[in-house]
Amino acid sequence: MSQDAVEATEELVEERERKSWVIDLRPLKVVAYRRMWVGNGVSFFGFQFTSVAVPVQMFAVTHSSAWVGLLGIAGLIPLLIFGLWGGAAADVVDRRKLLLASSTLAWLATVGLFVQALLGMRSGYLLLGLTALQSAGFAVSSPARQAIIPRLVPARLVPAANTLAYTTTTAGGVLGPLAAGLIFGLASTATGVTVAYLVDAALFTISFWATWKLPPIPPIEPEPGEERPTAGLSGIVNGLRFLVTQPVLLLSFAVDIIAMVFAMPRALFPEVAADRFGGGSAVGWLFSAIAIGSVIGGLTSGWIGRVKRQGVALVIAVVGWGVAIGFSGLVHQLWLMVLLLAVGGAADLVSAVYRQSILQVFAPDRMRGRLQGVFTVVVAGGPRLGDLRAGATADVTGITGSWAGGGFAAAGLAMVLAAAFPALLRYRPPAMAGNDEPIVSKP
């Protein structure tokens, strides 16, 4: 076969892949990205054991959803402090080394959770402290991890790489809580949380391996006249200055904050599982439901990259999330609650892919870490504020008022914001900028 025929065949295959509704797997051909994808997926599966165990243990110790909600604040404060700094550092140092160091901190926090559970400590304050330490490690590692992706794959495959990353982590979000729920259904709470923390600590080592095998990812030298990034306050301020000049980015962050703060019902899952469904494995289903929907949304995501009015699609996805969460708070059948939460999860996957891809299109590599730091604060901080809101309002209005009312409020506020500031509704993606060549992985 001639070279022209080979190239024509490859173009035909790519065209079919672009038109397919099935998830785009082309980024997995890049060895470095594939290793990182595997490592992140396995470690996120393990982290879900901890994400279920900590609120379950907190509720068992305190018998209060308000205390469970405080876990949101314990996770939020380090995110605010270290998320922005970690993003600035990712623009200054080798991102691989930064990811290794920050992941070690998060792993040590998980080991601490295992030790306190093994020793039978019953301290809500200790759980809050270890949650804060784990959040600090995540806050630094997340901007570096996300800023690495455009350095590993060609620019045209960045949206597909983001979709693969979200789908894989949410698949871990399905299997992890289900497995954790099975543990809690078969064992006592004390035994269940101990095993859950141990599983997380063990699986985290796969992520270390994947990060170690990454190639060096040093900062790209700025062009003459461009800013040389710093990890200090001035570097963070310069990143924020760039952000405020991009109204589409600001609005995309704002609708996400609304969606997560008002509609995230996660802090209510332990109480609802115990009171409505008798405890046991129900808590695993509730924690898995949103992720189940996200996986389904990811596996059928081939259409996402073909949408031209991505701002409109983002708003529709956020409204769909709020409405689905609102109705799920009104039902008393476990299967129907799981189904509605899954619909919300599919909508959340769509909005997450658009937000991340919009950000990576706007940001040059020299500012990508800092903007990913802001993204980390918004995306990870929003649900934690949502935990606090849900727990606090549940003690005042009851479970239904906190859960359903928050979901419908999020949908309404997102529509009002989009109508008041139509820049997001008018957004269409520009051509992807930047170097189209991937970094070659270590052998």
Pin down the residues of each PLM region.
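Alpha-helical transmembrane-bundle signature of multi-pass membrane transport and export proteins
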Residues: 1-443
